[in-house]
UniProtKB/Swiss-Prot annotation:
Swiss-Prot/TrEMBL GO biological process terms: D-ribose catabolic process
Metabolic or biological pathway, per its Swiss-Prot or TrEMBL entry: Carbohydrate metabolism; D-ribose degradation; D-ribose 5-phosphate from beta-D-ribopyranose: step 1/2
Compartmental location: Cytoplasm
Gene Ontology CC, one term: cytosol
UniProt key word Nucleotide-binding: no
Protein's name in the database: D-ribose pyranase
EC number: 5.4.99.62
Top-level taxon of the source organism: Bacteria
Active-site annotation: H20
Functional note: Catalyzes the interconversion of beta-pyran and beta-furan forms of D-ribose.
UniProt-recorded Gene Ontology molecular function terms: D-ribose pyranase activity; intramolecular lyase activity; monosaccharide binding
Organism: Thermotoga petrophila (strain ATCC BAA-488 / DSM 13995 / JCM 10881 / RKU-1)
Catalytic activity: beta-D-ribopyranose = beta-D-ribofuranose
Gene3D superfamilies from the UniProt entry: RbsD-like domain (3.40.1650.10)
Length: 135
C-alpha cells in the first residue's frame, strides 16, 4: 500500500501521465464536466473535500508552471483566490497566473487530461493546473 503523496490511484495515475503543458482541472461540485472526460469525483459532502486541500496534495507530485482561474473569482471569491495563489506560490514562486472569463475557462478545461471534482461549494472554486518540466 502506498504511504505518501497522492493515495487515490486514479489521480496518481493522471499526474504520472502528465507531460509539459498538459492540464489538470480541479473543480467545484457544480462544475460541468464534459461527457466522456476522465474524472475523479471526490465529493462526499458539501464542502468536503475542499479545493485547497485537494490542490495541496496534488502539488506535492505535480510540477506546475501556470494556473488558470476564472476572472470572476476576483470579485465573487477573493478569499479562495488568495489562499490558492499563496499555496501554489509556496511550491514554485515562478508560477504564472492567468485569469480568463468563466466561459473561456470552461472551454479551456475541455482540453484537460482529467478532472478532479472536489466538494468545494464557493463560487468559481476551480483551477486548471498547467504542467511544467522538472529540468
Amino acid at each position: 500500500m502506498k504511504r505518501v503523496g497522492i493515495l487515490n490511484s486514479t489521480i496518481s495515475e493522471m499526474v504520472a501521465n502528465m507531460g509539459h503543458t498538459d492540464m489538470l482541472a480541479i473543480v467545484d461540485m457544480g462544475f460541468p464536466i464534459p461527457d466522456g472526460a476522465k474524472k475523479v469525483d471526490l465529493v462526499v459532502d458539501k464542502g468536503k473535500p475542499g479545493l485547497l486541500e485537494v490542490v495541496e496534495v496534488i502539488l506535492k507530485e505535480l510540477e506546475v508552471e501556470k494556473i488558470i482561474l476564472a476572472e470572476e473569482m476576483n470579485e465573487k471569491n477573493p478569499e479562495t483566490r488568495d489562499l490558492l495563489i499563496n499555496l501554489v506560490g509556496k511550491n514554485n514562486s515562478n508560477v504564472k497566473i492567468e485569469f480568463v472569463p468563466h466561459e473561456e475557462f470552461k472551454k479551456i478545461s475541455r482540453t484537460s487530461k482529467g478532472f478532479v471534482r472536489t466538494g468545494a461549494d464557493r463560487p468559481y472554486s476551480n483551477v486548471i493546473l498547467v504542467s511544467g518540466v522538472i529540468f
